[in-house]
């Protein structure tokens, strides 16, 4: 039956439309490599280095290639200019003004040439369109004086030149438009809140440990400035490739990670460093992930912090990510907040520090099942238990054996107490 279904599937694939360029298909889809989605793979000897989807600085490692419709960038020219690097932006700024001055300077020279003003230079009986305009250089200087409105001096337009008056109006209007566009572009680029994100910190590592008897994925965020981020909110996404039951390979699939959206804990009052907590429950993508399986999984957790800059009111966004190798199982963050005389002090020297804590090595699903069956003890600060959740089971069994005392022994003890 399996062979017949496989042959039928191959026939369907041959009949179907094949892609034009098979090189564009991901390698996993071309080779039909099955991807384990039930997290039952054995431990591998080591992981191969992988490319980050997002750098720790927040830069996305995605390159847009083979873009055919490049005209779309020109349809939103303002955003295109703002997104340019500073050296190209300054080059465009200089070229736009220079070309505008040269163009209108050529028009002023052309009017003088057609009217014959260049042939009557120095003739006091001749009334030119622009006085003291003797060539292209003087026409170029007159164009700069007109567009920048610095005031006429040696060169000035006369009343006997209607075409010059019309050109003066056109250049004044177009010059104002160019000024508004280019100065506005430079102002927006200067006032962008990207640099504000440089003072928003994320911990170098994320940790998984117990909090209120539940496994939680946690990371820390902080703000170095005294001016706060207004309406700060945070969200997280799991980036992980997967393969569907139909065999479709989905690279870099994005899954939401709940960091308090339903309870409002994702809205932050970021005055001091905060630990963001994701409770690993039935809806969590880490529900069936144990400590051993964490060492073989390949994923990336992207965290995004958004808010408005208090000084400018502009929206600011800071991003970071945690690879699977940057998630520490059985660790907690070192406290950074201390109470001083009259104020709280934050020690950023220990912002990224963690310490080991007693945490079961089993997945959250097994931990919840053991808790429902009553086989799990309360975890207190102590050396790590061996064998994941096995230590917790042994401790629970020992406690049950201690509670089951013989009736004769308990009765003799009561007799001694009464005596």
From Swiss-Prot:
Residues the record lists as Phosphoserine modifications: 5
GO cellular component: I(KACh) inward rectifier potassium channel complex; plasma membrane
Site residues (Role in the control of polyamine-mediated channel gating and in the blocking by intracellular magnesium), renumbered to this chain: 179
Reactions the enzyme catalyzes: K(+)(in) = K(+)(out)
Record motif Selectivity filter, residues: 149-154
Membrane topology reported for the UniProt record: Multi-pass membrane protein
Regulation: Heteromultimer composed of KCNJ3/GIRK1 and KCNJ5/GIRK4 is activated by phosphatidylinositol 4,5 biphosphate (PtdIns(4,5)P2).
Region (Disordered): 1-24, 381-419
Pfam families: IRK, IRK_C
Biased composition (Acidic residues): 396-407
GO MF annotation: an example: G-protein activated inward rectifier potassium channel activity
Extracellular side: 112-135, 155-163
Cellular compartments annotated: Membrane
Cytoplasmic-side segments: 1-86, 186-419
Subunit field text: Associates with KCNJ3/GIRK1 or KCNJ6/GIRK2 to form a G-protein-activated heteromultimer pore-forming unit. The resulting inward current is much larger.
Task of the protein: Inward rectifier potassium channels are characterized by a greater tendency to allow potassium to flow into the cell rather than out of it. Their voltage dependence is regulated by the concentration of extracellular potassium; as external potassium is raised, the voltage range of the channel opening shifts to more positive voltages. The inward rectification is mainly due to the blockage of outward current by internal magnesium. This receptor plays a crucial role in regulating the heartbeat. Can be blocked by external barium. This potassium channel is controlled by G proteins.
Family stated for the protein in its record: Belongs to the inward rectifier-type potassium channel (TC 1.A.2.1) family. KCNJ5 subfamily.
Name of the featured protein: G protein-activated inward rectifier potassium channel 4
The species this protein was found in: Bos taurus (Bovine)
Lineage of origin: Eukaryota, Metazoa, Chordata, Craniata, Vertebrata
Gene this protein is translated from: KCNJ5
């Amino acid at each position: 039956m399996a062979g017949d279904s496989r042959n039928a599937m191959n026939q369907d694939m041959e009949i179907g439309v094949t892609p034009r360029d098979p090189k564009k298909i991901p390698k996993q889809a071309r080779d039909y490599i099955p991807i384990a989605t039930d997290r039952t793979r054995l431990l591998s000897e080591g992981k191969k280095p992988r490319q980050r989807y997002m750098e720790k600085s927040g830069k996305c490692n995605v390159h847009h290639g083979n873009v055919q419709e490049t005209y779309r960038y020109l349809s939103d020219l303002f955003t295109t200019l703002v997104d340019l690097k500073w050296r190209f932006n300054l080059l465009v700024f200089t070229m736009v003004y220079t070309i505008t001055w040269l163009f209108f300077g050529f028009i002023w020279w052309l009017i003088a040439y057609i009217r014959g003003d260049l042939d009557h230079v120095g003739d006091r009986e001749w009334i030119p369109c622009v006085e003291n305009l003797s060539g292209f250089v003087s026409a170029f200087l007159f164009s700069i004086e007109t567009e920048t409105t610095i005031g006429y001096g040696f060169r000035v337009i006369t009343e006997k030149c209607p075409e010059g008056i019309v050109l003066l109006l056109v250049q004044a209007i177009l010059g104002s438009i160019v000024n508004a566009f280019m100065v506005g572009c430079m102002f927006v680029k200067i006032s962008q809140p990207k640099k504000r994100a440089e003072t928003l910190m994320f911990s170098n590592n994320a940790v998984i440990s117990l909090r209120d008897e539940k496994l939680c994925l946690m990371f820390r965020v902080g703000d170095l400035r005294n001016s706060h981020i207004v309406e700060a909110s945070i969200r997280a996404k799991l980036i992980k490739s997967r393969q569907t039951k139909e065999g479709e390979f989905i690279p870099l699939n994005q899954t939401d990670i709940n960091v308090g959206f339903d309870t409002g804990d994702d809205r932050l009052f970021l005055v001091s460093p905060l630990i963001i907590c994701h409770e690993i429950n039935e809806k969590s993508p880490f529900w069936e992930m144990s400590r051993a399986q964490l060492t073989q999984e390949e994923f990336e957790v992207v965290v995004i912090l958004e808010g408005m800059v208090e000084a400018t009111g502009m929206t600011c966004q800071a991003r970071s990510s945690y690879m699977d190798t940057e998630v520490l199982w059985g660790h907690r963050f070192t406290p950074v907040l201390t109470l001083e005389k009259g104020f709280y002090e934050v020690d950023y020297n220990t912002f990224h520090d963690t310490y080991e804590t007693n945490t079961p090595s089993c997945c959250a699903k097994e931990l919840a099942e053991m808790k429902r069956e009553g086989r799990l003890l309360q975890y207190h600060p102590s050396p790590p238990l061996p064998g994941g959740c096995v230590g917790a089971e042994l401790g629970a069994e020992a406690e049950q054996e201690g509670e089951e005392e013989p009736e004769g022994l308990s009765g003799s003890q009561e007799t001694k107490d009464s005596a």
